[in-house]
């Protein structure tokens, strides 16, 4: 007997549910690991999509410190850290790792090193 393929709507709903889980994990982990980050993204998953943004005065340096540790975030002027969550290939464990790395960077103030504050022409 042949199994029927899931509908497009079903697949999209599964992807949305996973994206919500990934962003929820990231937001909740950072609420305790890095409370100095000001969450800009709506807490309601139906209003936030698959990205999470925080405000922090030294956002550029934080993103550079994360890149040095292999975690790619996005910087937006003047002080925004932005992270995208692709549910097709990102795993929950990778989100926990990213939150942990960001938490350690914030707690250790690793971002406050000169090499992370030097602005590149293109980011």
PLM features per residue range, with description:
Residues 1-6:
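Short glycine/serine- and small hydrophobic-enriched flexible loop segments
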Residues 7-55:
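Conserved small-domain helix->loop->beta segment predominantly found in fold-type I
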Residues 7-10, 58, 94, 111:
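Alpha-helical structural elements of signaling/regulatory helical domains
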Residues 42, 55-57, 76, 84:
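Generic beta-strand/beta-sheet core signal
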Residues 55-60, 89-92:
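Helix N-cap motif at beta-to-alpha junctions
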Residues 65-123:
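PLP-dependent enzyme catalytic core of the Aspartate aminotransferase-like
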